[in-house]
């Protein structure tokens, strides 16, 4: 930290990365009058940080805030509006409007914006109890005080803030946040939790899409606000229909069965040809559509709604789409969800550049090979790798070559074989198990072929239901079906015997879709490593992340089997992986041996 703007550490699950980083960063920053920002991807990761801070608070004074955006922390917004899309700017306008009304004497405009925001009682709860964001939201509901404004008011006194990546990597939001905190970027130390996700996070923040569904919402909005003329004989709804027809025609003519990469200018070409108008005329209409959206926002603001407009969102995105960089972005056209076009970010280093203005600590159990991480994120910093620290005999990892999840061989017989192997293992070994599938589709097809009871992380499961399922799993034991790279792949702790076995029902290769093909081409052009950077390394990271769920202490034992004949190629990333011809018996015998060692000390 003293020699570089950042450091990177790979260390196994359970080795104490979080508490080490927290204590080091807090000590380093306190000596230099700096602050600490801990960035997380999920609520479960935030909860783990809060848990570690609570343990540290017995030996050092810690003032922490679990900061999140208004979308998650505004009680009033959830009560008065039900938008499918929202942005930070619109919600900030809504909030400021309500605050002005309260200060003008209309306390009913927002019953949560009151003197309690700055009260000693609220601040004591925040700094003494060290609540999670969810716990502080509940506190706000119970006590009729705004959680977001209370956090903002307490920010200047905070030593450390825990926040989502997306919150800080949004430049406009970050600048306001830092201003409220009273610090500049060079006055903070940033801890990047589960940093192997940083490339995907950067790409996600840098990407956007225009869908038929968003156009339908814009159309309904136009009808609700008078559908005025934008130009001679062209109403708002007419322009939206022009856009929708062009998008649907492109999807119909270009996509076939799946998504395709197009040129960014192709959409504008379709618009010109189908509507017999010049690009200049179309851009002028889009500018008028944006202005109409601003009118809608003002009208919503007058009646106390969130000033967000689907029309202005569509207009700004289409203009941005047409002007996008063909080198670092890919224009993707997809028939999914009714059809959409997407500007997919291929190079996240520009999005992540702002992090270099602060000291950074990059932590993960899977940063190696670091050249891959460094190339993609743009961070050329010192890297240290800590090897396995727990007894090797406590872990069994193998792959079974009797099945494969390869798409062109995955027929009904192969699915039957995979289901039979999974069922044999579950019924013979009888341990708490998560079965990870490469996709929801494969999970559904295998699930129909097994007879044992199990729980399931289905597509779109909400946080409350996920936590309820995990609580039942920990209490009653059993089996969960989940998806690789999903919410149960990382960031959730399973100490002791809460999780003893993992089955990877196929390798979690990236989907061979247009985005991943574009990533392959980009990395091949830039580094000559298209296959490694777009397929091999991301797959190896997912496998290692899932294996990392098993062992968290020297007393834990766990087994993992990969049901895919292609898994042998990943031995260089998992040196202790064996090959098995009878996974059920081999795993059963492993646990029998582990029990004998525990009983007799052998």
UniProtKB/Swiss-Prot annotation:
> Where along this sequence does the record place binding of [4Fe-4S] cluster?
74, 95, 110, 146
Cofactor dependence is on: [4Fe-4S] cluster
Which positions bind ssDNA?
531, 566
Q: Which reaction does it catalyse?
A: Couples ATP hydrolysis with the unwinding of duplex DNA at the replication fork by translocating in the 5'-3' direction. This creates two antiparallel DNA single strands (ssDNA). The leading ssDNA polymer is the template for DNA polymerase III holoenzyme which synthesizes a continuous strand; ATP + H2O = ADP + phosphate + H(+)
Which Gene3D superfamilies has this protein been placed in?
Answer: 1.10.275.40, Bacterial XPD DNA helicase, FeS cluster domain (1.10.30.20), P-loop containing nucleotide triphosphate hydrolases (3.40.50.300)
One GO biological process term is:
DNA repair
Helicase ATP-binding domain location is 1-247
InterPro entries in the record: ATP-dep_Helicase_C, DinG/Rad3-like, HBB, Helic_SF1/SF2_ATP-bd_DinG/Rad3, Helicase-like_DEXD_c2, P-loop_NTPase, RAD3-like_helicase_DEAD, XPD_DNA_FeS
Q: What class of enzyme is it?
A: isomerase
Write the Enzyme Commission number(s) for this entry. 5.6.2.3
Q: Which Pfam families match?
A: DEAD_2, HBB, Helicase_C_2
Q: Which residues cross the membrane?
A: none
**Could you tell me which PROSITE patterns the record lists for this protein?**
HELICASE_ATP_BIND_2 (PS51193), HELICASE_CTER (PS51194)
Effect in UniProt of substituting residue 531 to S: 500-fold decreased ssDNA-binding, no measurable ATPase, 3-fold reduced helicase activity
Similarity remark: Belongs to the helicase family. RAD3/XPD subfamily.
Function noted in UniProt: ATP-dependent 5'-3' DNA helicase. Thought to be involved in nucleotide excision repair (NER) of DNA.
This chain's protein is named ATP-dependent DNA helicase XPD
């Amino acid at each position: 930290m003293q020699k570089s703007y950042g450091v990177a550490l790979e260390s196994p699950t359970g080795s104490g990365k979080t508490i080490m980083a927290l204590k080091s960063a807090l000590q380093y920053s306190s000596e230099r009058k700096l602050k600490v920002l801990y960035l997380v991807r999920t609520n479960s990761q935030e909860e783990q940080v809060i848990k570690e801070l609570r343990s540290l608070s017995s030996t050092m004074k810690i003032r922490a805030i679990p900061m999140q955006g208004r979308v998650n922390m505004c009680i009033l917004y959830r009560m008065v509006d039900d938008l499918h899309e929202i942005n930070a700017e619109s919600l900030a306008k809504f909030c400021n409007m309500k605050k002005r009304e309260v200060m003008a004497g209309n306390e009913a405009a927002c019953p949560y914006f009151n003197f309690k925001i700055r009260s000693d009682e609220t601040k004591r709860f925040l700094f003494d109890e060290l609540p999670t964001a969810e716990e502080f939201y509940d506190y706000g509901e119970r006590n009729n005080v705004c959680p977001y404004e209370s956090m903002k008011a307490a920010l200047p006194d905070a030593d450390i803030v825990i926040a989502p990546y997306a919150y800080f990597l949004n430049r406009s939001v970050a600048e306001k946040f830092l201003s409220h905190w009273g610090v500049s970027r060079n006055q903070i130390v940033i801890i990047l939790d589960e940093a192997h996700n940083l490339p995907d996070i950067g790409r996600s923040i840098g990407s956007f899409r225009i869908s038929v569904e968003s156009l339908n919402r814009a159309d309904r909005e136009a009808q609700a606000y008078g559908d005025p003329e934008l130009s001679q004989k062209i109403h708002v709804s007419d322009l939206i229909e022009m856009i929708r027809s062009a998008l649907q025609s492109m999807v119909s003519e270009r996509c076939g069965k799946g998504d395709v990469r197009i040129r960014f200018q192709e959409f504008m070409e379709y618009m010109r040809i189908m509507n017999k108008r010049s690009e200049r005329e179309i851009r002028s209409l889009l500018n008028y559509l944006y202005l109409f959206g601003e009118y809608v926002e003002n009208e919503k603001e007058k009646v106390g709604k969130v000033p967000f407009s689907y029309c202005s969102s569509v207009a700004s995105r289409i203009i941005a789409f047409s002007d996008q960089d063909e080198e670092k972005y890919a224009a993707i056209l997809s028939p999914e969800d009714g059809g959409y076009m997407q500007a997919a970010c291929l190079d996240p280093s520009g999005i992540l550049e702002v992090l270099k203005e602060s000291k950074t600590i990059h932590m993960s159990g899977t940063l190696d090979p670091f050249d891959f991480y460094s190339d993609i994120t743009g961070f050329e910093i010192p890297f240290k790798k800590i090897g396995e620290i727990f007894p090797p005999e406590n872990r069994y990892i193998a792959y079974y070559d009797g099945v494969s999840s390869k798409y062109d061989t995955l027929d009904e017989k192969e699915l039957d074989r995979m289901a039979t192997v999974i069922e044999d293992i579950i019924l013979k070994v009888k341990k708490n198990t998560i079965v990870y599938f490469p996709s929801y589709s494969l999970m559904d097809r295998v699930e129909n072929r097994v007879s044992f009871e199990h729980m399931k992380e289905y597509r779109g499961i909400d946080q409350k239901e996920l936590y309820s399922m995990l609580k039942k799993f920990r209490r009653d034991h059993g089996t969960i079906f989940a998806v690789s790279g999903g919410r149960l792949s990382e960031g959730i702790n399973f100490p002791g015997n809460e999780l003893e076995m993992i089955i990877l029902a196929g390798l979690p290769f990236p989907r061979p879709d247009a985005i991943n093909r574009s990533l392959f081409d980009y990395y091949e052009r830039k580094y000559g490593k298209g296959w490694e950077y777009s397929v091999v390394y991301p797959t190896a990271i997912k496998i290692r992340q899932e294996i990392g769920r098993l062992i968290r202490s020297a007393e834990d034992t766990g087994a993992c089997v990969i049901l895919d004949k292609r898994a042998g190629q990943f031995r260089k990333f998992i040196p202790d992986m064996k090959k098995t011809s009878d996974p059920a018996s081999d795993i059963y015998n492993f646990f029998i041996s582990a029990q004998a060692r525990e009983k007799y000390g052998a």
